[in-house]
Amino acid sequence: MKVLFVASECAPFVKTGGLADVIGAVPKALAPLGVEARVMLPLYPALRVLSEGGKTVWSSDNLHGGAARLLDVRAEGLDLLLLDAPHLFDRGGNIYLDADGTDWPDNPLRFGALSWVAADIAANGAAGWQPEIVHAHDWQAGLVPAYLHQMDAPKPPCVLTIHNIAFQGLFSPDLMAPLGLDAALYTQDGMEFYGNLGFLKAGLAFADKITTVSPTYAREIMQPEFGMGLEGLLRARARDVSGILNGIDTDVWNPETDPALPKSYSLKGLKAKQQSRQAVLERFGLTPPDNAPLFCVISRLTTQKGVDVLLDVVPDLVARGAGLAVLGSGDRDLEAAFVAAAHRFPGAVGVIIGYDEDLSHLMQGGSDAILIPSRFEPCGLTQLYGLRYGTIPVVARTGGLADTIIDANEAALAATCATGVQFAPVTPDALSHAIDRCCDLFAERKTWSGMMRCAMRHPVGWETSSKAYLEVYDRLLGG
């Protein structure tokens, strides 16, 4: 089976969030199941080195104002189709934002181009390769199903995966014609969204199947609280919607082989985790006592992630003698508030604004628990990394967090299957209580050790989820 993945980012080449990790991992997980996958993404400056020796399999003299070509490249175990359109993608800043943190004004043309080329390849093939399934991801590839829908030629079915419904790609309807979209598609049942052209809505309206990244999130987004205005469309298409949990790349995230850790460790020998703990303490300038847990946060600093609620309970956490290491960036006000907390509680709270992949690995290896107080979380990956490294997740009971973490209640502790601490609602009182529970569990060393071992045994790879994706593909092909 041949499958074309279409996305705006892919690890390890270019990454701004969990989407990249998924796109970098799923094709590899599907390969043993007989799926021949290729990943189409833009050729950003960071990927330019990959283009050397790439084979041109498609070209155009004018793709939204400039020449473009599609390069067939193999790198890091992935078959890539890189859209080389320098006028659209060869620029500094973030892949979505300029140096000032503002959306590139031509983002609809940039990702509309990606979607159009993907649809063209889906319908017509390239260099003898043509997909049987197209799998588009998030709003950046949301127009792929729409372009396929308006084609008269035979074309493969399309799956759209929602990684975060909060990001919808809303633009002026004046772009319909420049994007080559049929005006008849701009309806309430199509891609119109409160007077805007909705890229994600277009995908939801015209994809043959819709998936999202956890069963709980699939149910949540059909309700007004989480659906961001798209809940009605999703309820109407409920039979076509399924939730498939994300996994992680267990080769990349492996405490037995992770080069970012000062010393590897495993279920057979957890003592070496203490060396990573000491390294984290030194990096963040922390001095909590050995009998108190070291909490970490590795997150975008936004209200969606609930870190504003965490700020309210930092004094309670410090009063318990615990330490807190924070790595992340996001809203400037929240960044400043965390830096202020570090100044207020020296030795107890350490903050590094930004993102560092190696440091995130070290923090997973060296922390005792990871705090994830998200108001909503489609799936979440950091809690899965925590499980893999025996770093106990303390999570809000929502989305994929609810699906992947077994709360340390009396029944779960008695059955020796607890892997973390859940709490709800996302309020300072509930989070403070969850932190208290975690500290109490940490004090019971035998109980804590058992939770660590349960966490590390918990399956977090792609084996089950890749089979679920294959089932979706098979159903579309009549299998």
From Swiss-Prot:
Family annotation (CDD domains): GT5_Glycogen_synthase_DULL1-like (cd03791)
Catalytic activity: [(1->4)-alpha-D-glucosyl](n) + ADP-alpha-D-glucose = [(1->4)-alpha-D-glucosyl](n+1) + ADP + H(+)
Entry GO terms, CC: cytosol
One GO MF term attached to the UniProt entry: alpha-1,4-glucan glucosyltransferase (UDP-glucose donor) activity
Protein's pathway: Glycan biosynthesis; glycogen biosynthesis
Enzyme class, spelled out: transferase
Pfam families linked: Glyco_transf_5, Glycos_transf_1
Residues that, per the record, bind ADP-alpha-D-glucose: K15
Protein's GO biological process: glycogen biosynthetic process
EC number: 2.4.1.21
PANTHER family: ALPHA AMYLASE DOMAIN-CONTAINING PROTEIN, GRANULE-BOUND STARCH SYNTHASE 1, CHLOROPLASTIC/AMYLOPLASTIC
Name of this protein: Glycogen synthase
Organism in which the protein naturally occurs: Roseobacter denitrificans (strain ATCC 33942 / OCh 114)
Taxonomic placement: Bacteria, Pseudomonadati, Pseudomonadota, Alphaproteobacteria, Rhodobacterales
